[in-house]
């Protein structure tokens, strides 16, 4: 079973669909942790209601790579296999992308122009 780590900054609407797909066994995965850089992001509430471990990490007054290293530690703590970016409104550092090479998927609700 794939252990998912979710990074999100917004409502996390797509998280609901992923939870439903897991519950109906359409998706053979487990959401191990949800991390947000926005304290009041509804994605954290979705995680709480569904009893998914969740963390808030502020990105303010911190260099991008240091922020990414804090996220990295949490993802390792939960033995994450694959990261889903669901409305994550931060640009990830080159370092983070190398560490998680081919293990990051960006979920975007529409086509970009």
List the predicted regions and their residue ranges:
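One-carbon transfer enzymes
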Residues: 1-113
